[in-house]
């Protein structure tokens, strides 16, 4: 019996060591997250006014927090370089591929020929639209500082994309394809808001400064 007790004690000590190591690793990762989060804040502060305004305006969209907004602005750059929403959709590689056979055109999987990092971020954001439209406190506060046109676009995106998600899932489409379709339309709203920021020259307005 004493040997069994010793084995039990040794096992507990080993478990405690492993648990302590995991806690230390979690703390270190939390410190890294805080470090990079602060670095992102500093980068936003040093960015041109128009960039700061765009980053803030995009956060009015559901599923687009600070890091996602920064990624979108960094990867897309000037939204005005795309004349139509379909062009930025193609840039992300979220448009269906097409195959011609005689007189018939068939659509296949998405091309994936565009910016893969941007595409991944959009798909992650698109998952948020499975929930019913609502404004979280952060979004309410943010939209209060934005022009009505941008706030209206963000709300319209919630209504449109949630409905899109519901209709496609009702057709028993695979969830992956449904979210990809939602992501494709989401980039259209992102493009529209980015263009609106540029058109209104919001970079000079204090109420939309980051």
What do the PLM-derived regions correspond to, one by one?
Residues 1-210:
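A detector of single, family-specific signature residues
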